[in-house]
Amino acid sequence: MIRSMTAYARREIKGEWGSATWEMRSVNQRYLETYFRLPEQFRSLEPVVRERIRTRLTRGKVECMLRFEPDASAQGELILNEKLAKQLVSAANWVKMQSDEGEINPVDILRWPGVMAAQEQDLDAIAAEILAALDGTLDDFIVARETEGQALKALIEQRLEGVSAEVAKVRAHMPEILQWQRERLVAKLEDAQVQLENNRLEQELVMMAQRIDVAEELDRLEAHVKETYNILKKKEAVGRRLDFMMQEFNRESNTLASKSINADVTNSAIELKVLIEQMREQIQNIE
């Protein structure tokens, strides 16, 4: 299915530990480039996140951001560092014995850095939930790419219809153009008072027809239209293939323009260039 390289997705999850939000956005890029902004607690997840993205996307500049907000009320139970507390009590008693002044305040002991600490949250369990949310965010992200891709596909198909119409128009004009050119050549010879034998005249007319004959270019343009339709039906990433097809379209339209000796053909050649350029602009954003 056709996918755009421009997309955005956001997904938030909540648990007893707090909340986490994934945000993903991307723009067109020749290759796949990934950029991450992860909180310090989950910086180690970057290789896993990068690999999961690479297995599902092939092109685009992708920015991936994780916001993590722990719930203060969900902190674990307080843990007493008994060893440190005993050391502080012993030190306080020694000071009292030396000066025979002051009393030990238990609250002061508990306030001492490192004596009391909240039990750390299970970051591994939280990381598992966060990675599951990443998979869901990627699902949403790909759906957004595919939705935009279908819109791009419709625009390209409209331009392909325009190309086919211009090809048919030029093909319909060719007998008339050849006859007009024949009469023009004969008139020039008469004006120049040049008399040619019938065989020689026919040879000149054949050579002239070969120079302005665009049947091959029209055939190839029609073949390119058909092949582009086939590419648009493929399920894998097709951006590079479509870009190559636009190069082929350009080559034939340039040849058609160079052979043009008629205003109608010239106008069609110009219109073809416009249609091809419009398709190329859309294709630059296809994965």
Curated annotation (Swiss-Prot):
Q: Which GO terms describe its molecular function?
A: RNA endonuclease activity, producing 5'-phosphomonoesters
Phenotype upon knockout is: In strain JSG210, wild-type growth rate and motility, increased biofilm production in vitro, decreased persistence in inoculated tomato cotyledons (cv. Tiny Tim seedlings). Wild-type strain JSG210 has high persistence in tomato plant organs; fresh produce contaminated with Salmonella contributes to food safety risks.
By its UniProt entry, which Pfam families does this protein fall under? Answer: YicC-like_C (PF08340), YicC-like_N (PF03755)
Which key words are in the record? Endonuclease, Hydrolase, Nuclease
List the InterPro entries hit by this protein, alphabetically. YicC-like_C (IPR013551), YicC-like_N (IPR013527), YicC/YloC-like (IPR005229)
**Keyword Nuclease listed:** yes
User: What are the coiled-coil residue ranges?
Assistant: none
Which Gene Ontology terms describe the biological processes this protein takes part in?
A: RNA catabolic process
Q: Which cofactor does it need?
A: a divalent metal cation
EC number(s) per UniProt? 3.1.26.-
Q: What does this protein do?
A: Probably a ssRNA endonuclease.
| Family, as annotated | Belongs to the YicC/YloC family.
Q: Which NCBIfam families match?
A: YicC/YloC family endoribonuclease
Protein name as annotated: Probable endoribonuclease YicC
Species annotation: Salmonella typhimurium (strain LT2 / SGSC1412 / ATCC 700720)
